[in-house]
Design a protein with these regions (language model features):
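Internal acidic/polar
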Residues: 8-9, 90, 97-128, 195
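Short amphipathic alpha-helical boundary/capping segments
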Residues: 14-18, 127-136
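C-terminal edge and immediately downstream basic/flexible tail or linker adjoining helix-turn-helix-like DNA-binding
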Residues: 2-6, 47, 140, 158-161, ...
Length: 197
């Protein structure tokens, strides 16, 4: 049992190797570390909260079943995000291209606790969410994976089973649309900060 206390200090590659050897607690640590990031990616891709939770769970189950395929060439988080992205695309296609954004719940209200900077950032995030919803599905997926999910263009292309050049085009068009939509009326900061903010 002494090894359990060292799991949080271990690198993802070490945890994956332990998980491949049957250590469920090691895989549990990977889920604890990366679960929120995977759910967040799925939400940015357009999944409702409950769907994002279900798809994240499915992604980690698939990752557990395929853990011997993880070689550590990239990060574990990028690997499991690619799995999650593929599951989301499959889910989206099965839904016969139903507009998943139509039923998206309204964002939670901005809490004003006296910190104007925090309130401003919350408002920017809401604006960004609305701007992302205005993109075509393929643009939103590519922008969400590359900027919100931290995947490279090549990793996003693999996750979406789409040619690399197409992903790059979708990202460029999506960012151009976001810049136009989010540009302050009289100039100011650009969308790049807001996308990463």
């Amino acid at each position: 049992m002494a090894l359990k206390t060292t799991l949080p200090a271990m690198h993802d590659v070490e945890l994956a190797a332990l998980a491949a050897g049957g250590r469920r607690d090691a895989f549990g640590e990977l889920v604890r570390r990366h679960g929120s990031a995977v759910r967040g990616l799925l939400r940015r891709m357009g999944a409702e909260a409950a769907t994002a939770d279900d798809l994240a769970q499915d992604a980690f189950l698939a990752a557990f079943e395929q853990i011997t395929d993880f070689r550590g060439d990239g990060t574990f988080q990028a690997w499991v995000k690619r799995i999650a992205a593929r599951l989301y695309v499959r889910h989206w296609r099965k839904a016969a291209h139903v507009d998943l954004l139509a039923e998206t719940p309204e964002p939670e209200g901005v809490h004003h606790d006296g910190d104007e900077g925090e309130a401003h950032m919350a408002a920017l995030r809401i604006d960004l969410d609305e701007a992302l919803k205005s993109l075509a599905e393929h643009e939103r997926l590519c922008v969400s994976l590359c900027y919100g999910g931290g995947l490279s263009h090549a990793e996003a292309a693999e996750a979406l089973n789409t040619p690399l050049g197409t992903v790059k085009s979708h990202v460029k068009r999506g960012l151009d649309k976001l810049r136009r939509r989010m540009a302050p009326p009289e100039g100011g900061d650009g969308v790049e900060r807001r996308v990463h903010g």
